[in-house]
């Protein structure tokens, strides 16, 4: 907060801010005078009324250096108080900071403390809000002291009395009223604020605390203990915040100018009676202004109206008291005053809020001025308007360098005007500022020369809203241009997410030397080439540039001058420029420089062989010796721009290759060279895109001839499926799923063929194919729609939860080139519109997610180099993930610090010693070493630094490939990295124009690579069946869940890939088989789970009764009956129960095997039917989500994980390892028991109808789900502990980003957020600490509390100790040992003691919203959500904000404690001479240690 220099109320060097309830003395001490009249300004003179709400005497003059009556004008009278009007001569800015007050006729209760939940006053007095309300609003009397009459009448303290009861006692005991108020015998009962004030004043907090703790320990009633705990929290808060009154020396208060401290200015802690006010502060008039409008009317702040109501009612009440009005009238007036004050403080909480006359909206009270987006916190303190800024439309500037931007002259002269004026005056071109301004207005030519010199070397900042990550603001060197639009470099568009369809950008001028330095060194666009979220380049050429480079480096057989031999690159360029050599010709060039490892194979050598052998042999030898290079003319031209260090790039350059090159360059040769390379390839790309003249015509989209054949086949297949359905062998659900699969496959085949057709057209020079293959524009999906078939369309749903609609089973067979039929067009519009409307709706959700992430992580800053932890995170090589295209093992370990030695288990060689950073090269080695199965790395999740995190646990800063520096705001970077791509996570906007993608449910699983088959936990049966053609087929059917097939490398025995085999799968391989790539391993039914007979016998139905537990549905089309198990609860009486199951009995009638049948199962056997192993007895349909991924996809899923919400239908999870058995069945649930070898048993109740995954006798591990449904993160935390839940959350969120959006986010960003979600613990037993049971506190606070009692003991018997030592007290062990030594010497009885008990707790997983609200910083939490609640709680507890995070420092106007704003940098002072580097390092280390000590002290 910046105050004027006149009376600086807040010194700039404060380090913390304390919140407490203002005492009546402090309200008066801050006030400059009492506001007595409700008037604001005089209607004729428009000057403030004296003693009114705008009074100059109280708040200061309305004009600089001029008093109200005009006696004193000019600055020379500064500080004089006018003897006529009493106004001090000073600047008008004091009207922004001087406060007044209103002295109330009766005490009034502060609405925040009475209406907050739980009510603070209610908790202290043990009264409900309803009862409090009746007392405060003058409906009932409350007994303050029962006295003698109370004892006789059986009335206790705090009893409520009606008016009749009260007057009855008063009249009955008239004499009693003559006693002194302090006499304990006097009966006292009051109402309103006065009563509450007296009750709070007489409270014994210490007594209450003892009593409540006793209830907590001894009470058996859960409700009583919960109430006591709620009250104890408030009592303890007051006890801790109250400090004995102490007078503060005048000097030390820093709140007022020296000569102006009111004498009774006393600083003290909170007393409960302060929640009742005797005077109300009046905020400075400039903060509630009166603004004149045209037509003589005034616009006023709502606060003035609210204050006016209070003053009018207060003055009227004073008058009524003076004239001794009847009690009824007084009571009504007092109630109205209480209501007026309530409305002033918080108008939105009341049901009958005070409204304005004309528009009938509720008036904005003081609370509303703080709350929400338009409140003081978010509007003026976190987001401020800035000067020296401008905005304009952007256009592309292809000729700019990467670090430049084009700034229109008219904008530049406005922005840099003060500097230009100074330069003009200095050089004597203008005599004064005024004349300089005139020159500028006339646009004199000399002005432009001066402007050029002024802006030289002065960067400007460009920003495009929304600023989703730090690359949304970058610095550029401006170059002056004509016109009115800002020009920006095409390569920075990706970072800004800018395009040139009318986007606007803002320009800001960094003014101070430090700001300019930071802009040039840290923010210049040529230094920001890498994305902090993934470590991948962001300045990647796109569109025309990529197309140009691709066209340039492609080869075309039969080009002019093909297979020529050249002795230098220069010769090649000359021949090409002379027109003797085609751009795409394959040629041989003598070259002895470095070569890039990867290259394309070119065929020119084969052509030479066809021509003759001598030349061929010589060339072959030269190529082998690497003195000759087979390449193309275009690639020689391209390599002119490539730095020598990288070598000669002999590949077709598409977007992927360009990205990889830029990444390599930035890490190998640094940013300067990379920026130069980027500028060069930009030029080359644009030039050859123009030369190639590439454009798309209708004839470029080629439809494959085989399309009709494939469509016929698909129609045949779908007819076959319908026939099977008609025969009754398929359910309707299976028919639908199989038809969708048929079309999905066909669509993919046609798409692939159309792609291949394009590829072959014109030797790969089809413009459409080139745009697609280079990555310049378009995707395979779009080509499929243009030249293949549009395929299946998803039917949009209304739901906003992110659930996709199902797929329409009739596909769109036409493609866009052929044109759609009317019906097909109608179907596709539906999906396309849904996509567009989703896009606009989801943006707000993504923005809100980003905001919550920022709030939860904003105070995570790197504060130390090494926390010294011994724990790490195990990262395992996951074969399934690697082959399914998820993040590779090397990506997960790259840039981390090894917690333990990483070594090759086969050779025993150490690859990375503990404490070393795993670089890109080392990660590559580890990835290729089969002997490394896992690596233990340092992680943010296991970091043990108390404040912030340490740089070794974080690892490298992804954008600079170096270990992160102390002071880096990694929390904010993490929030930006997750929030920015969040916008791309649509509510699965059905991709291109609503076509459905994804979910082909594969029936066959094929080998990903070759190797030897190995079975793991697989149980099978053999089954012979006769197929449609009447031939007998043998099948091996899996009858165990979660069996695995491993493909093993024959030489090393290493598992290359692991496949989970579902129950009921048909195996196509046996253990020990050698398989080839793409060989079928097993086939399975993807749309249902099967119940399969495992033995020979006869089926017997149990509890399967027609009309009760199953229904018979006859399909109208096929005439076949289908038996489906139904929910039977509604069919039976409350006491009855059923458990449908299939039993297999042997010849003697003994039950051999029982299978429970869940609701919705379809039966495939009759009662009494004979079965053999492998027969399908029933199928349980699976709820397949056909539009890819999980049911809730994309953004809603990410939000669900970050908020740690319990899923809607969570799985029941076992808490112990053991064996499953089924217990009794109740009406609505059945028992599942898990028993382990030690006899421990857990019982779980499962809702009837929920599908149970475990069978009788199955072995299960702790944390394994027993039923279907999503596993709740809270369960994982409870059963498997914090590490497991952290890993689970990181992996699940990563999956959504990877699979749904293909976005790469480094794990460490997610870890930072997840760490914040697990920062709190809940106290179970407080032991001998000062904590309360059920308290939710920071882990560091908990450890500190335990540390405090670790050296203390509890006295069990005091013996002959001195009187200060009493039983049951806590004392230091050292002190007691010393006393016992003395007692032993004197042969007296020793003190008996036992160690103090430490508190116990369990970790709590909070969602990001709760975690942000639970932050230690009051200011940060208040600016996030629930402002009034946060401030009320903070004031009661007397909380101190240590200003540790970023947000709170921005709000109080200090430098943020990150980067150069860290404490350790402030400690360093540079002398006249340069400090030696080692000295500077030592000073920094010392400063850091000092900062840590201070942090610990605080």
Curated annotation (Swiss-Prot):
Binding site for Zn(2+) 2: 867, 943, 950, 953
N-terminal signal peptide: none
Highest taxon listed in the record's lineage: Bacteria
SUPFAM superfamilies: beta and beta-prime subunits of DNA dependent RNA-polymerase
Binding site for Zn(2+) 1: 67, 69, 82, 85
Enzyme class: transferase
Regions that span the bilayer: none
Recorded GO MF terms: DNA binding; DNA-directed RNA polymerase activity; magnesium ion binding; zinc ion binding
One example of a Gene Ontology biological process annotation: DNA-templated transcription
Pfam families, per the entry: RNA_pol_Rpb1_1, RNA_pol_Rpb1_2, RNA_pol_Rpb1_3, RNA_pol_Rpb1_4, RNA_pol_Rpb1_5
Required cofactor(s): Mg(2+); Zn(2+)
Family named by the database record: Belongs to the RNA polymerase beta' chain family.
Xref: NCBIfam families: rpoC_TIGR
Alphabetized HAMAP family for the sequence: RNApol_bact_RpoC
Name of the molecule in the record: DNA-directed RNA polymerase subunit beta'
Taxonomic source organism: Chlorobium luteolum (strain DSM 273 / BCRC 81028 / 2530)
Gene this protein is translated from: rpoC
């Amino acid at each position: 907060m910046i105050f004027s220099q006149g009376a600086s109320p807040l010194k700039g060097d404060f380090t913390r801010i304390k919140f407490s309830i203002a005492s009546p003395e402090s309200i008066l001490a801050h006030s400059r005078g009492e506001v007595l009249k409700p008037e604001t300004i005089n209607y004729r003179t428009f000057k403030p009324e004296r003693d009114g709400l705008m009074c100059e005497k109280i708040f200061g003059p309305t004009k600089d250096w001029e008093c109200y009556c005009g006696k004193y004008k000019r600055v020379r009278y500064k500080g004089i108080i006018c003897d006529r009007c009493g106004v001090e001569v000073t600047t008008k800015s004091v009207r922004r900071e001087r406060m007044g007050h209103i002295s109330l006729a009766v005490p009034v209760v502060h609405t925040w403390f009475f209406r907050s939940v739980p009510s603070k006053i209610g908790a202290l007095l043990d009264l409900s809000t309803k009862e409090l309300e009746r007392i405060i609003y003058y409906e009932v009397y409350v007994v303050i002291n029962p006295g003698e009459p109370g004892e006789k009448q059986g009335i206790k303290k705090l009893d409520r009395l009606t008016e009749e009861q009260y007057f009855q006692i008063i009249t009955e005991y008239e004499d009693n009223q003559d006693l002194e108020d302090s006499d304990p015998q006097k009966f006292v009962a009051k109402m309103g604020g006065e009563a509450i004030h007296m009750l709070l004043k007489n409270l014994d907090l210490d007594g209450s605390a003892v009593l409540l703790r006793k209830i907590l320990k001894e009470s058996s009633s859960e409700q009583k203990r919960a109430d006591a705990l709620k009250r104890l929290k408030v009592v303890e808060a007051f006890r801790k915040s109250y400090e004995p009154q102490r007078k503060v020396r005048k000097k030390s208060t820093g709140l007022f100018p020296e000569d102006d401290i009111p004498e009774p200015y006393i600083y003290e802690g909170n007393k409960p009676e302060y929640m009742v006010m005797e005077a109300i502060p009046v905020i400075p008039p400039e903060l509630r202004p009166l603004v004149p409008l045209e037509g003589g009317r005034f616009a006023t702040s709502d606060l003035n109206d609210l204050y006016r109501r209070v003053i009018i009612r207060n003055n009227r009440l004073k008058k009524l008291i003076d004239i001794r009005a009847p009690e009824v009238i007084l009571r009504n007036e007092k109630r109205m005053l209480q209501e007026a004050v309530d409305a002033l403080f918080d108008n939105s909480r009341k049901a009958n809020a005070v409204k304005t006359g004309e528009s009938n909206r509720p008036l904005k009270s003081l609370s509303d001025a703080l709350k929400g987006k338009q409140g003081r916190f978010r509007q003026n303190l976190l987001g401020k308007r800035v000067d020296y800024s401008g905005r304009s439309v952007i256009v592309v500037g292809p000729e700019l360098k990467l670090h430049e931007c084009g700034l229109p002259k008219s904008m530049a002269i406005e922005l840099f005007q003060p500097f230009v004026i100074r330069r003009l005056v200095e050089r004597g071109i203008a005599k004064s500022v005024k004349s300089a301004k005139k020159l500028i207005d006339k646009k004199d030519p000399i002005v432009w020369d001066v402007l050029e010199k002024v802006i030289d070397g002065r960067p400007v900042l460009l920003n495009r809203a929304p600023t989703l990550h730090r690359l949304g603001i970058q610095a550029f060197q401006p170059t002056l241009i004509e016109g009115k639009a800002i020009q920006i470099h095409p390569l920075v568009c990706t970072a800004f997410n800018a395009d040139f369809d009318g986007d606007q950008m803002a320009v800001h001028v960094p003014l101070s030397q430090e700001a300019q330095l930071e802009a040039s060194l840290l923010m210049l666009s040529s230094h920001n080439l890498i994305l902090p979220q993934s470590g991948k380049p962001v300045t990647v050429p796109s569109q025309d540039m990529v197309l140009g480079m691709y066209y340039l480096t492609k080869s075309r057989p039969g080009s002019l001058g093909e297979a020529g031999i050249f002795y230098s690159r220069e010769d090649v360029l000359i021949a090409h420029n002379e027109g003797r050599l085609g751009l795409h010709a394959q040629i041989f060039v003598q070259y002895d420089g470095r070569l890039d490892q990867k290259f394309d194979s070119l065929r020119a050598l084969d052509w030479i062989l066809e021509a003759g052998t001598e030349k061929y042999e010589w060339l072959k030898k030269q190529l082998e010796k690497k003195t000759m290079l087979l390449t193309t003319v275009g690639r020689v031209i391209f390599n002119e721009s490539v730095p020598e260090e990288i070598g000669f790039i002999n590949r077709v350059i598409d977007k992927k290759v360009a990205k990889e090159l830029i990444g390599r360059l930035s890490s190998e040769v640094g940013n300067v060279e990379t920026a130069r390379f980027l500028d060069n390839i930009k030029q080359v790309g644009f030039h050859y895109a123009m030369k190639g003249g590439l454009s798309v015509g209708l004839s470029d989209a080629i439809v494959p001839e085989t399309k009709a054949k494939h469509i016929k086949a698909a129609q045949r297949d779908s007819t076959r499926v319908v026939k099977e359905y008609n025969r009754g062998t398929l359910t309707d659900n299976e028919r639908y799923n199989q038809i969708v699969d048929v079309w999905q496959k066909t669509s993919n085949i046609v798409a692939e063929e159309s792609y291949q057709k394009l590829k072959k057209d014109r030797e790969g020079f089809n413009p459409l194919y080139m745009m697609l293959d280079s990555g310049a524009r378009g995707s395979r999906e779009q080509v499929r729609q243009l030249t293949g078939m549009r395929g299946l369309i998803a039917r949009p749903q209304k739901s906003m939860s992110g659930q996709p609609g199902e797929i329409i089973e009739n596909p769109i067979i036409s493609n866009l080139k052929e044109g759609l039929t009317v019906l097909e067009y109608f179907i596709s519009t539906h999906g396309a519109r849904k996509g567009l409307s989703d896009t606009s709706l989801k943006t707000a959700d993504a923005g809100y997610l980003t905001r919550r992430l920022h709030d939860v992580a904003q105070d995570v800053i790197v504060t130390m180099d090494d926390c010294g932890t011994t724990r790490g995170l195990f990262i395992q090589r996951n074969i399934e993930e690697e082959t399914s295209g998820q993040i590779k093992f090397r990506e997960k370990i790259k840039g981390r610090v090894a917690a333990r030695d990483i070594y090759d288990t086969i050779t025993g060689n150490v690859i990375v010693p503990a404490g070393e950073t795993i670089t890109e090269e080392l990660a590559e080695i580890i990835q290729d070493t089969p002997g490394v199965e896992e690596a233990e790395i340092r992680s943010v999740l296991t970091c043990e630094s108390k404040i912030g995190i340490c740089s070794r646990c974080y690892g490298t800063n992804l954008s600079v490939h170096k270990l992160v520096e102390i002071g880096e705001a990694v929390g904010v970077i993490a929030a930006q990295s997750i929030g920015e791509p969040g916008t791309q996570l649509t509510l699965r906007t059905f991709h291109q124009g609503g076509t459905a993608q994804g979910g082909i449910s594969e029936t066959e699983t094929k080998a990903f690579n070759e190797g030897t088959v190995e079975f793991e936990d697989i149980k099978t049966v053999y089954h012979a069946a006769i197929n449609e053609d009447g031939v007998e087929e043998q099948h091996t059917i899996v009858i165990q869940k979660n069996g695995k097939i491993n493909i093993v490398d024959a030489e090393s025995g290493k598992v290359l890939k692991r496949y989970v085999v579902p129950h009921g799968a048909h195996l196509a391989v046996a253990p020990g088989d050698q398989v080839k790539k793409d060989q079928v391993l097993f086939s399975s039914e993807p749309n249902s789970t099967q119940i399969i007979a495992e033995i020979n016998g006869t089926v017997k139905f149990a509890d399967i009764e027609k009309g009760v537990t199953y229904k018979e549905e006859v399909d109208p089309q096929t005439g076949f009956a289908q038996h489906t198990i139904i929910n039977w609860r509604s069919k039976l009486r409350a006491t009855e129960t059923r458990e449908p199951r299939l039993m297999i009995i042997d010849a003697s009638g003994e039950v051999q095997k029982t299978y429970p049948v869940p609701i919705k199962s379809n039966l495939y056997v009759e009662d009494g039917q004979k079965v053999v192993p492998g027969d399908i007895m029933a199928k349980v349909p699976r709820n397949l989500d056909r539009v890819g991924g999980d049911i809730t996809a994309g953004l809603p899923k990410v939000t669900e994980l970050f908020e740690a919400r319990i899923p809607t239908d969570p799985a029941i999870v076992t808490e112990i390892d053991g064996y499953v058995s089924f217990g009794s069945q109740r009406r609505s649930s059945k028992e599942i028991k898990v028993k382990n070898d030690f006899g421990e048993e857990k019982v779980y109740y499962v809702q009837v109808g929920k599908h149970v995954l475990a069978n009788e006798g199955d072995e299960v591990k702790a944390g394994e789900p027993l039923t279907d449904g999503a596993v709740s993160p809270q369960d994982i935390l409870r059963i498997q502990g914090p590490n497991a839940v952290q890993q689970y959350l990181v992996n699940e969120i990563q999956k959504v980003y990877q699979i749904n959006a293909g976005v790469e986010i480094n794990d460490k960003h997610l870890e930072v957020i997840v760490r914040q979600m697990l920062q709190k613990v809940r106290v179970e037993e407080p032991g001998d600490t000062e904590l309360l049971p059920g308290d939710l506190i920071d882990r560091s606070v908990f450890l500190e509390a335990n540390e405090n009692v670790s050296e203390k003991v509890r006295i069990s018997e005091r013996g002959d100790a001195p009187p200060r030592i009493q039983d049951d007290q806590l004392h230091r062990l050292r002190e007691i040992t010393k006393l016992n030594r003395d007692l032993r010497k004197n042969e007296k009885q020793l003190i008996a003691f036992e160690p103090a008990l430490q508190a116990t707790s369990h970790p709590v997983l909070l969602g990001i919203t709760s975690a942000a609200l639970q932050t230690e910083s009051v200011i940060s939490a208040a600016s996030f959500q629930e402002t009034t609640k946060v401030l009320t709680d903070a004031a009661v507890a007397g909380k101190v904000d240590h200003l540790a995070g970023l947000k709170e420092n921005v709000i109080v106007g200090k430098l943020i404690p990150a980067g150069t704003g860290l404490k350790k940098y402030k400690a360093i002072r540079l002398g006249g001479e340069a400090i030696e580097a080692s000295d500077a390092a030592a000073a920094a280390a010392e400063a850091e240690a000092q900062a840590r000590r201070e942090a610990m002290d605080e």
